[in-house]
């Protein structure tokens, strides 16, 4: 990236098929009470007042549709074969303009994330932390299980957290993490940063930042929007 640093950019990987949702369309394009999930996710980022630009990675055959839905609100790029490739392509798209100081990566499926959570995250970044993720304490007991279905142990719940998005990073750290991503499978961007030795801090998450993955999640999302 060239031309100095400025502001906060957000990347929204929205190229997944959404097979578990079984909605008949890619998950990000599901209509939740009149607005697609990706539309709600992007607008929530802007409503925070701390995000300057958004890049959305969508299925290659949905780029025109995404441009119609989002208009000039976001830059649209064709996503890749997996989440890591989609985010990488979105990062490349950011290089066309002024390099942001920070980059947030936010799941389109967490479409109801409150703008206040985005503000808390960016405040932590501006306070000097290079990587910040929102988390919630676990309420269920967690078991480690082997391939044969045998319980190996019970991790101490007090030290475990469920991780949400958006996840925020200094641009330099996130770019370095993606340069060293290789072929390893990472389920989130914080894992990539941990892989290159980055220290990740946490900020309090929000129950409304839940990930819409299955039909039960959809029922909850509709209920939340309807109030």
From Swiss-Prot:
CDD domains to which the protein is assigned, alphabetical: CDP-ME_synthetase
Reactions this protein catalyses: 2-C-methyl-D-erythritol 4-phosphate + CTP + H(+) = 4-CDP-2-C-methyl-D-erythritol + diphosphate
SUPFAM superfamilies: Nucleotide-diphospho-sugar transferases
Site (Positions MEP for the nucleophilic attack) location in chain: 157, 211
Annotated signal peptide: none
Pathway in which the depicted protein is active: Isoprenoid biosynthesis; isopentenyl diphosphate biosynthesis via DXP pathway; isopentenyl diphosphate from 1-deoxy-D-xylulose 5-phosphate: step 2/6
Site (Transition state stabilizer): 20, 27
EC number: 2.7.7.60
GO biological process, alphabetically ordered: isopentenyl diphosphate biosynthetic process, methylerythritol 4-phosphate pathway
Gene3D superfamilies recorded: Spore Coat Polysaccharide Biosynthesis Protein SpsA, Chain A
Single Gene Ontology MF annotation: 2-C-methyl-D-erythritol 4-phosphate cytidylyltransferase activity
Name of the top EC class for this enzyme: transferase
Keywords: Isoprene biosynthesis, Nucleotidyltransferase, Transferase
InterPro entries given in the database record: IspD, IspD/TarI, IspD/TarI_cytidylyltransf_bact, ISPD_synthase_CS, Nucleotide-diphossugar_trans
Biological function: Catalyzes the formation of 4-diphosphocytidyl-2-C-methyl-D-erythritol from CTP and 2-C-methyl-D-erythritol 4-phosphate (MEP).
UniProt family annotation: Belongs to the IspD/TarI cytidylyltransferase family. IspD subfamily.
Protein name according to UniProt: 2-C-methyl-D-erythritol 4-phosphate cytidylyltransferase
Origin species: Mycobacterium ulcerans (strain Agy99)
């Amino acid at each position: 990236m060239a031309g100095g640093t400025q502001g906060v950019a957000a990347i929204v990987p929205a190229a997944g098929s959404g097979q578990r949702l079984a909605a008949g369309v890619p998950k990000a394009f599901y209509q939740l009470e009149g607005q697609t999930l990706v539309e709600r996710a992007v607008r929530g980022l802007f409503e925070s007042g701390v995000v300057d630009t958004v890049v959305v990675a969508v299925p290659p055959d949905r780029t025109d549709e995404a441009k119609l839905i989002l208009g000039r609100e976001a830059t649209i790029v064709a996503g890749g074969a997996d989440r890591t490739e989609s985010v990488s392509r979105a990062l490349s798209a950011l290089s066309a303009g002024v390099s942001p100081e920070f980059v947030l990566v936010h799941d389109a499926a967490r479409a109801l994330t409150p703008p206040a959570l985005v503000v808390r995250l960016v405040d932590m970044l501006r306070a000097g932390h290079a990587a910040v993720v929102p988390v919630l304490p676990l309420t269920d007991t967690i078991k480690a299980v082997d391939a044969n279905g045998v319980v190996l142990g019970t991790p101490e719940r007090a030290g475990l957290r469920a991780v949400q998005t958006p996840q925020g990073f200094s641009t330099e750290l996130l770019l370095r993490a993606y340069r060293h991503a290789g072929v390893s499978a990472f389920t989130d961007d914080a894992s990539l940063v941990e892989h290159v030795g980055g220290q990740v801090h946490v900020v309090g998450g929000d129950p409304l930042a839940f990930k819409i993955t299955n039909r039960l999640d959809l029922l909850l999302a509709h209920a939340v929007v309807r109030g």
